[in-house]
Design a protein with these regions (language model features):
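N-terminal glycine-rich phosphate-binding loop and ensuing alpha1 helix
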Residues: 2-51, 56-58
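Residues at secondary-structure transition points
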Residues: 18-21, 26-30, 49, 53, ...
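Conserved N-terminal catalytic core of the sugar/cofactor nucleotidyltransferase
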Residues: 33-96, 162
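Catalytic-core segments of class I nucleotidyltransferases/pyrophosphorylases
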Residues: 131-162
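Conserved beta-loop-beta/alpha segment of the NTase-like Rossmann-fold superfamily
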Residues: 76-143
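A general structural motif
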Residues: 1-3, 44, 94, 123-124
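Hydrophobic packing residues within well-ordered alpha-helices of enzyme cores
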Residues: 17, 58-62, 115, 149
């Protein structure tokens, strides 16, 4: 059965703040939990959280949430390595995947649903929301682009597909 998946990127080292941003409090929970809650309250059917540098800490926080997780052994190679880890985790028959940064709790379920609707109505394989002439999140990638994602060089980003 084809499904819409979310890939939540939570493998980074959080060096800039000195403390993992995803574990900071936000609206009565942590930032990563708010991201998960927003995804769960959307039309997304399955979710995988990509873990890395602080996997033990994040796993403790998200343990009771109905999400799957995978571990990116090469998280130091950057965000694209985490995206690829998430895509490797997806079943072969998924319909599309939305890529979410694990530290952006303000991506509402409504925004996610609009991206999914645009995908289904347009027939396009890649959908990226734009706000104020700036590209945003979540980026939706159809299963037909799975191989292209897996072949991207580390220096390239997903935006090269869009």
């Amino acid at each position: 059965m084809s499904e819409i998946w979310a890939i939540i990127l939570a493998a980074g080292e959080s060096k800039r703040m000195g403390f993992p941003k995803m574990l900071l409090p936000f609206r009565g929970m942590t930032i990563i939990e708010q991201v998960i809650e927003n995804v769960i309250n959307s039309q997304v059917e399955e979710t995988v959280v990509v873990l890395g540098a602080i996997s033990d800490e994040i796993r403790k926080v998200i343990g009771n949430w109905p999400v799957k997780h995978c571990y990116n052994e090469v998280y130091k190679e950057g965000m694209l390595s985490s995206v690829k880890c998430g895509f490797r985790f997806l079943p072969h028959d998924f319909e599309a995947a939305l890529v979410f940064p694990g530290d952006q709790p303000l991506i509402s379920p409504e925004i996610t649903d609009k991206v999914i609707s645009a995908f289904r109505l347009s027939g396009k394989g890649i959908i990226m929301p734009v706000y104020g002439n700036k590209r945003g999140h979540p980026l939706l990638i159809s299963s037909r682009y799975r191989e292209e994602v897996m072949l991207l060089d580390p220096g390239e980003g997903l935006r090269t597909l869009a």
